[in-house]
């Protein structure tokens, strides 16, 4: 059941419903979970719940039409503070937390959250992209969390609790958001008219890792065209790893200069490869071919000339999963892409160490 238009997080809704009913509102929350599953949207709706002038917060049902609710949606509510990483920066500037120059400690979120509420009964701060707090910024924020101002609520939005200082984790109530189910992602894509075709929406959802942001990014014809080239190369009995690596690096570079879109594209391609090898391993064990017709064609071609066994195909899929886990940790995309594809080639031809 959707809460305020947010799908897939009924357990989180119930957790907050119980807390509010018991009057146990924390001063700091740490929202953690995969990118693109609705954490920031949930934070805004929760802020709207706490600031709504027409309905008590215990109902967890903001009216949506009072001035306070409208201002939250418009980003103009005087008691709602939001900061995040600027698009052109790799970190959240410490100035957003404590001010700059001679205004240091007299401006910024840590100062502003300490002020008395202007309109509602609370002051609320949302720190988006909290993964990108640097050490100085995190330590400045910690001072506020250690002595939270009365009637204040701070929400940090992060992908993982491990990305925060232990001292911040210990002072926060951690709220975990899970991947969205594929059916939910497909329904949202159709509702947003990313596509009007149910089969296409399901295909995008299947590769989205439960993230609506990733599903939207998958709706790119050039991406699927390149997937065909990648799978054609992987289906060869002796993959040309160097040629494939050059092509993959070039395609990832086309995503732009910023790291997030490049990493997302890399994840997409590694995910395609992992799916190919999973289906290949199953097909070598006489399982049914995949429903995706293009993928099935590449798998059948590989089955006919595969120089190894199903365990090798499964090992290749596992190597792709290892690559997915390391994408965010590697600054040099070209190097890890070359290593990943070289490892696959060695596994297929029996040259692995």
Q: Over which residues does each language-model region extend?
A:
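Clamp-loader machinery-focused feature within the broader ASCE/P-loop NTPase space
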Residues: 2-136, 301-304
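Conserved catalytic/switch belt of AAA+ P-loop NTPases
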Residues: 139-153
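Loop/turn-to-beta-strand initiation segments
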Residues: 120-124, 149-155
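Charged, glycine-rich active-site and insertion segments that engage polyanionic ligands
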Residues: 2-49, 150-152, 159-272, 277-353
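Short N-terminal helix/helix-N-cap motif within the alpha/beta-hydrolase-1
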Residues: 135-138, 349
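Arginine/glycine-rich "motif VI" loop of SF2 helicases in the C-terminal RecA-like domain
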Residues: 74, 147, 194
